[in-house]
């Protein structure tokens, strides 16, 4: 049987690859494996049209096992994480495909602390999903209840408002909510700092999430930041667990640069635990050089924010994240939260009295190119001699200062190629060559 769980839960095209039957089986499996007697599950969703369908299927599955389900409705993923950990819930299930296009959806399971599951528990859930019809359900008089509970969202909003209240700024901010769930609270929370906040792409219709907007398409935000004369712009993704920034000139500041800005600020204030920053293998070598030159250390993990958090917990680090914009600031949250990241950037800008462009300039990056290649047989790349030979040849041309990474995506049906080195032209050339060969060999 094909593996269901990727690096960020279960994903697929709604009602095609990912069906209500999967959500129903997941509801039953989660209730059986994670929910003890009297402990409910909480379910949230982003703004996709298919969200209601999947949430209803989860409810049907879990309640058939005698477990109550609290429905919080449309919320950011970090909100569901906070709600799950703050309440008496056995687990949380988020219906979201994050930055993916609207036809996709996904199912993320969180443990009682609001954290993503480790792979051992995921494997157990997967076996239960495939065999969910063999699970013994509750009797008719012991079925679980579906409980609408929108008030739970206030727990998250009030906590983030308390973080905002500790910042006093007059920055002019533009935030792109990706027509996703972050729009429910982002503007209100950022305005609590005293900032002048303009909100864009906050009109979800079920089909426009991440469509030409948000963290994966920051071009529209960049134009608006310049046109409005704003100090800084922030782009969330569809479930608001990541953020990409834009400086006053419209220049995109990615997750690596944001992490560098935050790490340098904390190193200077001696408030970076163990002087450590946890990043993925994709993070730019320039970030590593900058942090190490400032007296810090870099710890690298596999790609995926759950691995970032795992690395932070093991090492005692307080800051970690990915180039894609997931940033975890452990003193405030145990998950990536684009709104919290925006608050932290605003705080650093205000404290330093410097522009984001100036702050980011202190974190010079090596030329890096990434390609995403649709691949039907993406899991076969390691056994392909032509691909391995091409990787070795590219590494030889780059020399010791360069890197090549090829990996299957854990969230999309693509192979990802990353090439990094001091010569930008050579980096682009090699990335194109590897992308073309990989697409040819794996399709």
PLM regions with names:
Residues 47-52, 100-101, 178-184, 240-241, ...:
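Gly/Ser/Thr-rich loops at beta-strand to alpha-helix junctions
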Residues 121-157, 162, 248-321, 327-329:
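Proline/glycine-rich low-complexity loops and linkers
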Residues 1-65, 90-91, 146-173:
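An N-terminal, well-structured beta->alpha segment
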């Amino acid at each position: 049987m094909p593996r269901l769980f990727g690096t960020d839960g279960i994903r697929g095209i709604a009602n095609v690859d990912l069906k209500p039957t999967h959500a129903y089986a997941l509801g039953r499996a989660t209730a059986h494996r994670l929910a003890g007697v009297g402990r409910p599950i909480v379910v949230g969703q982003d703004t996709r049209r298919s969200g209601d369908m999947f949430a209803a299927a989860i409810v049907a599955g879990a309640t058939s096992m005698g477990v109550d389900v609290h429905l919080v409705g449309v919320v950011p993923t970090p909100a569901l994480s906070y709600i799950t950990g703050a309440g008496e819930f056995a687990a949380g299930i988020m219906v979201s495909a994050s930055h993916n296009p609207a036809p996709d959806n996904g199912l993320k399971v969180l443990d009682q602390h609001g954290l993503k599951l480790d792979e051992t528990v995921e494997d157990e859930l997967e076996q239960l999903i495939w065999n969910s019809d063999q699970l013994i359900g509750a009797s008719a008089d012991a079925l679980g209840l579906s409980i609408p509970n929108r008030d739970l969202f206030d727990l998250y909003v009030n906590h983030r408002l308390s973080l905002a209240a500790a910042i006093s700024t007059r920055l002019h901010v533009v935030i792109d909510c990706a027509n996703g769930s972050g729009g429910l609270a982002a503007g209100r929370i950022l305005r609590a700092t005293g900032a002048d906040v303009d909100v864009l792409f906050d009109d979800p219709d079920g089909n426009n999430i991440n469509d030409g907007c948000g963290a994966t398409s920051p071009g529209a935000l960049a134009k608006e930041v310049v046109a409005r004369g704003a100090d800084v712009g922030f782009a969330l993704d569809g479930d608001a667990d990541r953020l990409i920034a834009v400086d006053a000139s419209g220049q995109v500041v990615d997750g690596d640069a944001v992490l560098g800005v935050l790490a340098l600020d904390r190193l200077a204030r001696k408030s970076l635990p163990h002087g450590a920053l946890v990043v993925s293998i994709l993070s730019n070598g320039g970030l590593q050089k900058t942090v190490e030159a400032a007296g810090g250390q870099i710890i690298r993990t596999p790609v995926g924010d759950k691995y970032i958090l795992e690395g932070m917990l093991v090492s005692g680090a307080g800051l970690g994240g990915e180039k894609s914009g997931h940033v975890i600031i452990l003193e405030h949250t145990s998950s990536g939260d684009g709104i919290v990241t925006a608050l932290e950037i605003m705080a650093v800008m205000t404290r330093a009295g410097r522009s984001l462009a100036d702050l980011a300039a202190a974190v010079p990056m090596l030329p890096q190119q990434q390609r995403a290649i649709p691949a039907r047989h993406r899991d076969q790349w390691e056994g392909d001699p032509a691909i391995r030979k091409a990787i070795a040849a590219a590494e030889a041309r780059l020399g010791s200062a360069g890197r090549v990474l090829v990996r299957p995506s854990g969230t999309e049906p693509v192979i990802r190629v990353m090439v990094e080195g001091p010569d930008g032209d050579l980096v682009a050339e090699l990335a194109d060559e590897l992308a073309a060969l990989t697409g040819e060999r794996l399709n």
